[in-house]
Every structure is written in structure tokens, then in C-alpha cells.
């Protein structure tokens, strides 16, 4: 017969002494107590019988409460308990509030059983301790005058977590009062009077109804149309749906206390939110950042910083580097600049970028930094700087093998392997997975098939908001090649199907469903106009190769052209961009000194490291332990040869 282990043990707090008291086995008791339900109301309910009765009445009565406790199934399918906060009625029996709707309470899905305790203490103990139960119990801790008795167990609870909505009264609306006195009263004479008061032929139906016959005793402004209020004003049921962000500059110490070091200045980065023809491209920085920079030139201290931080000197050095970079390349992605700007002056880069560049928040150049005065819509030479976003699907990333193949992103500050240029690991060449999947077009043409498509591109006469200077078909070709090769590489396959790549390069239509039935379709959409008099495609024309012919002759399955191979292209979500670029916050931290800034950057780099224990090697785990406990890591390294997966034990 197996021996049962104790449910709990009581032991002394470990100290430095070698002799410790042996652990004491705790006494175990069975609580044979009644189970009772609990109703947590957002009301001030007293112990008086009338107060409890009123609370139950606001919930629809005791039967409604019982029905709510008996509900089963997922919380989404429960009807819940309706709590009417303003269930008042007027003297005529009608509702006081228009469309008064209740707050819905539902059963807690995870039942955490609570024990109700009856605490007995000598009379007058509470008054001696300022009516504090906690202090009263503490004062009787060492005496035998305190008695605690378990009474019952709460195992079923209904809570009201929704917000109460705004409630509306229509007492001061004449048309509402007339409607209420007629239809609301259900009196025939009132009905008849109301109907007769409405003109048969309204010569001015657009006028306020208050200007007609209805209750002329009340003056109503012509702007008050007396429209019925919306049935619900608050569109959010729970007060938790907000994008909370912790202070990125707050550091938590070992004792758990969070501390914010340094001061903060605003970078005043200029954004352009519209791509219409009327949009004027900025030619200089925000007036406030220009003013601050002029003050810094005179005083040698940037406003909001301290002189010993040397922020202005670092800013001047950063500006010199960025001006040279923007002279060579007018449009940049910030992550590319992170590897070029030296670590010691990197903290000034947001201010420097605000002084020499602006940003689009939409369109083909979104989230890039563009030199002031440069309008990428003005010339096709800026087509190569358009951005494309790619993403590995979650179903692939759930595989440990794929996770291991995907490269770790670079730290916040790093050193480019190309001095003064974009790190080669940001470029897509079909031979390795790039660090960052927000790719500019000119970083894709290192792949031969994409280069072939790019060099045969016929640009549009005018850039548009969706595809920029490119025709949609050309962008689709590039995207399909990237998605196919990217999906192969993350799965460890670097041998591509040449027939698939050939098909992608010679695609005639954006989608197979867009094959036109006539030759008058739009130019630039890959329309096959090479048809004879009967409308049949001329199969002898080599330049117009049928996609079906490629599939059948070269063994490409019918659905392969729709397979993204585990990689997708889409609009970037805001959260991903904020986490990756870290440049959407207008507030910039200014370190107290240069040394403080270097320490902060190192801490950020450590936080950015991604560590997965399922795919990490023995050495990776040892290195991780060494950061916390070097001595233990050294012992494990010398005594162990490796770890065994728990599934193999």
C-alpha cells in the first residue's frame, strides 16, 4: 500500500547556522462545512434587511439570482444576472430613464473556494484598535481570548465587472414627454390628441419638430432636433481594454523598487499622415526642436539636459554622421542606422533624426526617415526605397527547428559589418534569412530572380498610396519570390524549385481569379491581349506564356501558386513595429553622464536577448546560468556533460 505524503510541512526560516530544526508536519483537518454561493455587488449594501431586499430587487428578485447561479457552460454563453442601477418609475408607472440597461454579472469561471471565518474577540477590542480588524487580531495574538471558527465555504460567485453606462432622462424634451403621455400611457384620448396634433401635410419636414404644433409652450432652439439618444453610449464593457505601456526607462532594482534615472526631452519628430496631392512635404524640422538646437549652439547645453552629460557634443557628432548618410541615401530605416551610429552617441539619434528628416505613417514609404525637402512621390528614383513587410507564420514558428533557423534580431545598438553602410544581414539574397523583415526594395535585388524582375519593371506615371511607383503585378512577383524562398529557408531548405521561381517571374495576373474575359482590361494588370478573333489565346506567342501551361508542363501543383510557404506579407501591426523599432515614443531619455548611458544600453541589449530553453544548447544554458551565478555554472560545466530532455527519461 503506497504511503501518502503530507499535504504541507512547517519549517523554520533557513539561516546561516548549520543546525536547523527538523520540519514539523502540519495538522490536517477536514472541513465538513456547507457550501454557499456568493453575490458580489458594486453597491454599498448594509446588514439591514431592507438594504439586502433592495439589492436583490435591483437584480430582478431572488428567483433571477437563483437562476444565474444554476447556469453552466462557457462564460460567453451565460445570460448572467442583470443589475439595474436606475430601475426607477414615475407616478404613471413608466420608466424614469430612457432605455435604461443593466450591468451584467457572471459567474467566476475558475472557482477558488474561500472559507468564511467567524472571529470572536473580547468586547471593546475593536474600539481600542481604531476599528481595525487586523490590528485587533494582532493585539490578541499571544492570548487565548481570540477564537476563529470556520463557518462555511464559498464555491460559487457572481461578480459584476462591467462598467455602468451613462443613463439618460428625457424630462426636458417636449416631444419625448408628448410621446410618453400618449403611447406610454396607453390612453385612447391621449393617443387621439397626439395623432391629431401632427399635420397631415407638413410643408417643412426639414424643420425642427418643436417648431410645429407639439407643445408650443416650451421654446426649443432650432439646433435641437430632439433626436432619440443612442441605446448605448459606452462601447466598452470592461475598463481593461487600453494600451498600457510601462515606462521604458524605469529600471527595477533587486529589492523590487522601480526607479527612473535621468531626465527626458521631447524629440518633436515630424510625421506626414496623408499622401494626397495637396500634402506639403516638410522642408525643415519642428520649430521647437530648431529653437532648442539654436539655444544649445549658444550655451553648449541642450535644453533639458545637464552640461556634464555632454549631450550637445554627442548630438553634433551624430548630426555630422547622419548628414553624410542622408546625402548618400535620402531614405533610411532606423534599424539600419542603429548599426552605423556609434554606441557612445546613439542616445542622441532621435533628436538628430528629428532635425534632418520626417516620416510617413502610411503608404509605400511608411516608417522610414526621409530627408527634409525630398518628396519620394516626385521621381521614380525613390521607388527603390519603398518598404515591404514580411512575416513568418505562427504555425511554423511553433516548430523548434524553425525557431533555431530564424536568426536572433540584433540588439538595440550594434556594429554594422559594412563600415558606414547597411549591415549585410539586413539584405535578402536568398542565401540567408535577414535580421529584419521590413525590407526596402533595393535590399531585395541581391537575389538574382528579384533583380531580374526589378530591372524589367515599367514604372507608373504617378505614384499611388498602395503600390507607390510599381505596378501591382511587379510587386506581387517580388513578394511571391521572397515568401517562397523565405519559407524554404526557415525550414532549412536552400534548394529552390526553379520552375516555381520561373512561374513567379512570368506571372501574368495578380491572382488567377483575375484572368480577363476580354482584352479591354486595365493596362498594367498583366492582361493577356494576344487573342485571335474567336477570343482564344494564341499559344504560339512566346511572350505570353500561360500560367496553366507552366504548371502542367513543369509539374507545379494546381494550388502551389497560392501557397505562401509559411511566409506572408501584410500591413505591419503597431505593436510589432513599436517593439522592433523602439522609435514611436516622443520622449527621449537623457543620461546624467556618458557612462550611465553606456550602462543603460548594455542593459537593454541583455533584455533583448531571446532565450528558449527548448532549443538552447548545453553551452547556451550554462552561459545563461553564469550571468546569475558564475560559481554554479562553472561547477555544472566541469561535472556535467550535458542535459537530458525530460521526455527521454
Curated annotation (Swiss-Prot):
Keyword match Translocase: no
Modification sites for Phosphoserine: 617
GO molecular function per UniProt: DNA binding
Gene Ontology BP annotations: 5S class rRNA transcription by RNA polymerase III; transcription by RNA polymerase III; transcription initiation at RNA polymerase III promoter
Biased segments, Polar residues type: 9-19
Sequence repeat spans: 221-239, 400-419
Biased composition annotated in UniProt, kind: Acidic residues: 560-584, 594-610
Functional summary from the UniProt entry: TFIIIC mediates tRNA and 5S RNA gene activation by binding to intragenic promoter elements. Upstream of the transcription start site, TFIIIC assembles the initiation complex TFIIIB-TFIIIC-tDNA, which is sufficient for RNA polymerase III recruitment and function. Part of the tauA domain of TFIIIC that binds boxA DNA promoter sites of tRNA and similar genes. Participates in the interconnection of tauA with tauB via its contacts with TFC3 and TFC6. Serves as a scaffold critical for tauA-DNA spatial configuration and tauB-DNA stability.
Further details from the record: Present with 15800 molecules/cell in log phase SD medium.
Family, similarity comment: Belongs to the TFIIIC subunit 5 family.
PANTHER family on file: GENERAL TRANSCRIPTION FACTOR 3C POLYPEPTIDE 5 (PTHR13230:SF5), GENERAL TRANSCRIPTION FACTOR IIIC, POLYPEPTIDE 5 (PTHR13230)
Protein name listed in UniProt: Transcription factor tau 95 kDa subunit
Gene: TFC1
